Amino acid sequence: MSIVMRILLLTACAFFTASIEARHVVNFNSGWEFSPDGWEGVPRKLSIPHDFQMEMPWKKEAGGNRGFKPMGAAWYRNSFVTDSAWGDERVFLDFEGIMCIGDVWINGEKVASTEYGYLGFEVDVTKKIKPAGGTNTVEVWASTGDQWGSRWYTGGGLYRPVRIKTRPVRSIARHGIFVSTPDVSAVSATVRVQLELDGFRFDKSFWGTSNSANNVALTSRVEAVAIVFGPDGRRISEVRGDVPMMDYRKRTEFALSDMVVQNPELWDINSPKLHMVEVQLVKDGTVIDSDRLRFGIRKIEFSPEFGFRLNGRKVFLKSMSNHSDYGAVGVAQFDRAIERTLRQMRSFGFNAVRCSHNPYSESFYRLADELGLLVVDEFVDKWPEGTYLWSGRKPFLSMWPELMTEWIRRDRNHPCVILWSLGNELQQSERFSGYDTGDWGVTTYRMMDIFAKRLDPTRKTTVGLFPTRAGAIYLKDPRYRKKPLLPPELATVMDVASFNYRYEDYPDYLASNPNMILFQSEASTSKWLEPYFAMDRARTVGVSWWGAIEYWGESNRWPKKGWNYSFFSHSLEPRPQAYLIKSGLLPEEPLTRIGVVEDSGERLVWNDIHSGQYLLSESWNPGGKEARDVFVFSNAEEVELLLNGCSLGKKKTRFNVAKWDGVAYIPGRLEAKGSNGSAHFVETTGDAVGLEIVEESPGEWRADGEDLKYLRVYATDAQGRRVPNVSNVLRVSVEGSASVLALDNGDHFTDDMFCVSEKRMHKGFALVILRAGLEAGDVRVTLSADGIAQSIAVLTSK
């Protein structure tokens, strides 16, 4: 938050005659003890976020769906001292997520459980903690559940932040502020604030009463005040309203009068302006509680005529769909890991993310707000009747209202969120489609849709659909191609019809259901840009490539540890195909890129879709085939390929692709030139003699014990050119207040672990991930490899 904003908020709080102490929020991420075997052994000290499953060895027998990692459970333990400053406030332990299931004890008493690791919870421990000055012990048991509780790698443990929070007995509830902007134009915008309050039932000692002519009247008045601050910190609007006293309800819900903001600065993908609202509860001139949050003023619209509009302008979603691991750190939700991923996607032209298939961490949505990314926010994968693909100890169908309440109330103030997705690929089996009503999820969807709109009436809902026809007719069924092609039953009742794959069938679907709003919620990476160019982008919402980044789990064979038909490796190194996608998503930037075929790759049918990926490189070194196929990716209409200055011909591009088959290998320089002035070359290098270190986010490294620093390392020859065929062992040593969190090389097939200080480079590449300590200062990193000169980087944490 800016200094200007802090000053203005303090001024706002001081507007009234008095105020109570502010809410307290204590970071509870450090000082944990960890033991995978209970407390009989010697526990290990660590800080969270932490993914204990990523530290377990790869095991073939563990199965590919969870990334060949064994299932397991572990214990965490920490302590805190009851602070006298908390006074009479209620005290909560706030867990943003325990993967996959977990239980919580405080001072030896079990106080909470969670059945869905992708959503958080809080537990009121006010009556469980010791008096001021006393030490309280918190213990957490976390389990991955059994192997088939999930289809992908989930990780395990305290993988998201934990906090201690306090708030007054009479207060704004958890996620109790809801800000919406029902009317938005360039001239003015309506801002609506709805509140949920706790503790405002009748209490004579609080409200007071007077008797007059046999009537009882309250002598105290409680006001709710909402103050809106602009992106620059200026106070731009305010509204007040009386808090109603509810005789019997634990929670009070009401809306304040609408505010009007003149000439609003809108949140947009190209200019993500964020406002702030502060809500104060004021009793007789004294602020008794306050809370604040960021929001965006923006208008979203969906229609079969134009797909999606943001602030009145057509926007086509250029999206990725991925599970929420971050490579070598597993599912541990470090802000920096999330940010580097989103920034990388943004730089390659993506403007949206479909969360798959679960809510992401709170930091993800905050960063998406800041970076101007659109989000399709997804609730769960399936709606199962039993425990298959559900890790919870309680049935999903008994829990979804509670879980949906937490999910939507948590995320509804983020302007990045434009659509609620309630599930994914339910028509694979009726046991995944919710209640046993025989309609492939239609009844269950309608129930969930009503419930979702009770919590947030401003957004539409959808479900990602498996590529079957109505009646769950699969690809192998002879009726699959029989006309008319009828979409799955759910597609005809949803607000937005989200289809995974099969974009070529959309015209047939529209012929029978012309009012459907279409979104290609998953597209095959093996088809490259075809799903993007072949769609009617003027009338559809967007396209989202499945598995744009490598992820752990959903592997079809050992020793491949996960999905790898991707544009980016799990270390976020872009493959040549990534530049192809960029050339399409950012046509205003002339781009040409070479991809040399190393292997045609495997081909398989996955989810009734033909999948696979060429193994491409940017290497022109000896050791490969004597005749090599070469792709040229370009947003030029025509490209020319040259070898050592001699033209190999010109070709027109189709979907930004041209291909030369059987190019004879001759050492030297292979160059591609586009008719739009763009060019790219690869060339034969010398032997590796040095190491190039590329620091990501230079100058940005907080000494808070949680921030990460990424160093990309490349083997180079005497001319400084990167050498792609190097596999020397790289060794890392660190001096200063930091430690090696992980050492990666981008190899999705290796059995090596990440929590090491030495590892073989893979194709001349390695990635060093450092975790900051708590002391600011210089950190010296020394990298060495046999036969290669060492390299040193001096970094500074602040």
Name each region found by the language model:
Residues 26-28, 35-37, 66, 71-174, ...:
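Accessory beta-strand-rich segments of carbohydrate-active enzymes
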Residues 54-82, 86-95, 99-107, 112-115, ...:
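Active-site-adjacent substrate/metal-binding segments within catalytic domains
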Residues 119-122, 248-261, 654-659, 750-767:
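Aromatic sugar-binding surface patches on proteins
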Residues 28, 49, 57, 64-65, ...:
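An acidic-aromatic loop/edge-strand motif
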Residues 130-133, 194-303, 660, 666-667, ...:
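Extended acidic/polar, glycine-enriched regions
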Residues 206-210, 214-225, 270-275, 627-629, ...:
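Short flexible loop/turn segments that cap and initiate beta-strands
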Residues 24-42, 71, 98, 147-148, ...:
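Substrate-binding clefts and catalytic carboxylate motifs of secreted carbohydrate-active enzymes
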Residues 193-197, 278-280, 610-616, 630-633, ...:
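Beta-strand-rich structural segments
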